[in-house]
Amino acid sequence: LPLDVAIECLTLRESRRDIDVVRDPVEEELLKEVEVIEATKKALQQRVSQAFQQLCLLQEVRQQLCSDHRDKMESLDIDRGCLSLNL
């Protein structure tokens, strides 16, 4: 929404008649605001992408850990069965 407002303000300023078109501090600040918002938006999108990739990696690790845990529990049951046979 702030980006849309700043762009709309710039668009309205650019649509003025030739004698009303000025390059003043207000326009400079609007341009800076658009630039900052777009840079922040891009940085946030990169962070979201990185977070998603990390989440995918963590899910893979979790699945591997669950599989390892099942295997270890199965091995423990086998070892207990063998121990009871020896007694």
Curated annotation (Swiss-Prot):
Species name: Mesocricetus auratus (Golden hamster)
Source superkingdom: Eukaryota
Record's GO cellular component terms: axonemal A tubule inner sheath; axonemal microtubule; microtubule organizing center; nucleus; sperm flagellum
Annotated gene: TEKT2
Localisation per UniProt entry: Cytoplasm, Cytoskeleton, Cilium axoneme; Cytoplasm, Cytoskeleton, Flagellum axoneme; Cytoplasm, Cytoskeleton, Microtubule organizing center
UniProt cross-references to InterPro entries, sorted A to Z: Tektin-like (IPR048256), Tektins (IPR000435)
Coiled coil: 26-55
Subunit comment: Microtubule inner protein component of sperm flagellar doublet microtubules. May interact with CCDC172.
Similarity field: Belongs to the tektin family.
GO biological process: cilium assembly; flagellated sperm motility
Assigned keywords, A-Z: Cell projection, Cilium, Cilium biogenesis/degradation, Coiled coil, Cytoplasm, Cytoskeleton, Flagellum, Microtubule, Phosphoprotein, Ubl conjugation
Post-translational modification: Tyrosine phosphorylated. Ubiquitinated, leading to its degradation. Deubiquitinated by USP16, promoting its stability.
Listed name of the protein: Tektin-2
Entry function: Microtubule inner protein (MIP) part of the dynein-decorated doublet microtubules (DMTs) in cilia and flagellar axoneme. Plays a key role in the assembly or attachment of the inner dynein arm to microtubules in sperm flagella and tracheal cilia. Forms filamentous polymers in the walls of ciliary and flagellar microtubules.
Tissue: Detected in sperm flagella (at protein level).
